[in-house]
Swiss-Prot record:
InterPro entries: Aa-tRNA-synt_II (IPR004364), aa-tRNA-synth_II (IPR006195), aa-tRNA-synth_II/BPL/LPL (IPR045864), Lys-tRNA-ligase_II (IPR002313), Lys-tRNA-ligase_II_bac/euk (IPR034762), Lys-tRNA-ligase_II_N (IPR044136), Lys-tRNA-synth_II_C (IPR018149), NA-bd_OB-fold (IPR012340). Its EC number is 6.1.1.6. GO terms for biological process: lysyl-tRNA aminoacylation. Its cofactor is Mg(2+). The gene is lysS. It catalyses: tRNA(Lys) + L-lysine + ATP = L-lysyl-tRNA(Lys) + AMP + diphosphate. It comes from the Bacteria. This is Lysine--tRNA ligase.
Amino acid sequence: MSNSNENILNDLENLNELLRVRREKLNILRSMGIEPYGIDRFERTNLSSDIKNDYENFEGKTVTLAGRIMTKRSHGKASFADIQDRDGRIQIYVRYDNVGGKNYEIFKLLDIGDIIGVTGEVFKTKTGEITINVKDFKLLCKSLQVLPEKWHGLKDPDLRYRQRYVDLIINPSVREVFLKRTKIIKAIREFLDNRGFLEVETPVLHTIAGGAAARPFITHHNALDIDMYLRIALELHLKRLIVGGFEKVYEIGRVFRNEGMDIRHNPEFTLLELYEAYTDYHGMMELTEQLFAYVAEKVNGSTKIIYQGTEIDLTPPWKRITMVDAIKEYVGIDFEKVATDEEARKIAKDLNLELKKPDMKKGEVIALVFDELVEKHLIQPTFVMDYPVEVSPLAKRKRDNPAFTSRFEAFIYGREVANAFSELNDPIDQKERFLEQLRQREAGDEEAHMMDEDFINALEVGMPPTGGLGIGVDRLVMFMTDSYSIRDVILFPTMKPKD
């Protein structure tokens, strides 16, 4: 047997012994009349941060705190421990003479991970450590698992994602990411509410999967005896509300796409979509750059952020460039001079790009070349405008060039962070595009848009000129927290079950 295998077996044996000892201590405590799960409520006077941030006003005063034991050091008839609450850690000092013999024996039975409530006076040790001199304590919960403190934190990414509850206890930086995530979403709402937008909720279960090119999750409604889809976007219901007279609406909600997983994709994720009547995609550009700058300033204190070692300046205005011009700038090919689909496909092959289907149209090739060869170069915030109509079934055509649409995507660090249109409000054009998508679907494209007759009917009632915007909230949080993977900003990311 190799040394590494022997070490693994030894670690498992040691862990099993530690778990056995914890359950033994549980039984000992119960034999002493202590029920480790018996207290329903514990009143605190303060949090650790209150005392550490305002020591002068707390010195010598009696306080009551609660938290999880994170370190524990015994020296005969005196012990020190650190307890952790939601705001941080604080040291406690437990002395035999202060708490009594029985209580001190109980304290000696406690382990790292146990949750206790303490009452005592605030003082500083000789080394200057702010400490609670405990006069009384109560065991609020006995932990039967061993926290990985001996390895100075939980390091295995897979285990961190599966046991986020342990990750949050052990790694303070992880807690900060999710606290900041909450602040980011609050700042988004604040920004939009201040501009007169109305937050709404729309259905999660759809009879037609629409609003994006993505494979849906399918479920079955027993009472109606029909298959339904978990939503892949928020778009079509929100635009129905624009038709209904709500001129500024937004929703922040979960959407679900039955697709692959990587550092930027999780099957369920949080999406912001907003729609505003009587504006266009230029208005959405201004709103997007202002929103990003507002959130960065609110959460990080600056419109300049550091992402993966690169400084990103979110200060408006951002660079604006058409997709065709971006390809010309970074690849050296001018698609304005390409006349036919066949010529476009040849260019893709010459660039060693794999065609997704043999009959790809010029607009689809343009999007392919951009995705594969240009996107990665867009490090500083950039609006890429005027997408081909073939890849934009819900966007309005440009009047001066109907082969392209009034659509943009925003890119930061080579990644798409926002997608917006001047929304298509011509019901006849929309139906024709749905029919084309339907033909693609029948030809085997599972991501092609389904026909939505009710949405066509809504457009026939009449939708005013409208600008729409979608922002992946998780990706926004990644940038604002300098997180490498989307799994680092989702509390419980999708994971394959262990065998």
